Amino acid sequence: MNSLTKSINLDKVSYPQSTVKDYILLMKPRVMSLVVFTGFSGMWLAPNSLHPFISVIALICIAIGAGSAGAINMWYDRDIDALMKRTQKRPIVRGAIEADEALSFGLIMAFFSVFFMALCVNFLSALLLLFTIFYYICIYTMWLKRSSIQNIVIGGAAGALPPVIGYASVSGSVSLDSVILFLIIFIWTPPHSWALALFCNDDYKNCKVPMMPVIKGALYTKKQILIYSVLLFLTSLKPFFVGMSNIIYLVIAAVLGLVFLYYSISLFYDNADNKQAKRFFAYSIFYLFFIFLLLDFCRV
């Protein structure tokens, strides 16, 4: 039996009563935490001073916008989520929330996040938030994810936009500084996601999602991870050279980047199992959080 034909008819199952926890999980809280954190960094690194009320509203809107995109993503991907071990416990798959209910929830949150961003903050940040939600749902989830080996590379732009939104919410503009923040996340996303794809390769293959390890194999993927790791190392040093951060940032960012490179090289030469891919994946999360934390504390 074809793996896709084995997926559960999630629209016809009997659903138990939903809980608050189910709706929180529907919004992908781990992704939300990264989005909010990088969004705050964009706000903090903007040239203007932070307005307490507007800053809080902006962060809430960014969080709700990210949550809405996560909810609609789970609605659309419920068929393949049911087939993947990593996603089989998501709320729609296990019957905690109906598919139509999840879609309505996501759309309502998306509307209010953009509406209040425009009403209380500024139109530029609202437009950027709207574009980010649209890009993640329509360009990545509905189009690229299931059709292109470059799904993560191109689709990663959505995850890289929160600091730009945060920056625009304070400054009312987009500048070189915010573009550099975007580039750090944009270049970080492929190696991070491909490491996950390496140790979840069977799941992606089973669902016919054209992740790079599925189409090109592990060795080619590891080469790409190494290339992107070098690019990330170079990009992560740019904040110092454009006057965004001080020498402390440069030194620590260089060390973190070298460790990132070490893990990518170790992954490239690892032929045993997926342990090195899991180590690389775990470190990549730590790396991004710490780089943005450094930017916050070492700004000029």
Curated annotation (Swiss-Prot):
Classification via CDD domains: PT_UbiA_Cox10
Which cellular component terms (GO) are annotated to the entry? plasma membrane
What superkingdom does the record give? Bacteria
* Gene3D superfamilies the UniProt entry points to: UbiA prenyltransferase
The pathway this protein participates in, as annotated, is: Porphyrin-containing compound metabolism; heme O biosynthesis; heme O from protoheme: step 1/1
Q: Which GO terms describe its molecular function?
A: protoheme IX farnesyltransferase activity
Family annotation (InterPro entries): Protohaem_IX_farnesylTrfase, UbiA_prenyltransferase, UbiA_prenylTrfase_CS, UbiA_sf
Location of the protein in the cell: Cell membrane
Pfam families of this UniProt entry? UbiA
Keyword set, alphabetical order: Cell membrane, Heme biosynthesis, Membrane, Transferase, Transmembrane, Transmembrane helix
Which Enzyme Commission number(s) are on file for it? 2.5.1.141
Q: Which residue windows are transmembrane per the record?
A: 31-51, 52-72, 92-112, 123-145, 152-172, 179-199, 225-245, 247-267, 280-300
The record's catalysed reaction(s) read: heme b + (2E,6E)-farnesyl diphosphate + H2O = Fe(II)-heme o + diphosphate
Provide the primary localization: membrane
Q: Which PANTHER family match?
A: 4-HYDROXYBENZOATE SOLANESYLTRANSFERASE, PROTOHEME IX FARNESYLTRANSFERASE, MITOCHONDRIAL
* Summary of the function given for this chain in its UniProt record: Converts protoheme IX and farnesyl diphosphate to heme O.
The text of the family note is:
Belongs to the UbiA prenyltransferase family.
NCBIfam families from the xrefs?
cyoE_ctaB, PRK04375.1-2
Name the chain's protein: Protoheme IX farnesyltransferase
Organism annotation: Rickettsia bellii (strain RML369-C)
Lineage at the top is: Bacteria, Pseudomonadati, Pseudomonadota, Alphaproteobacteria, Rickettsiales
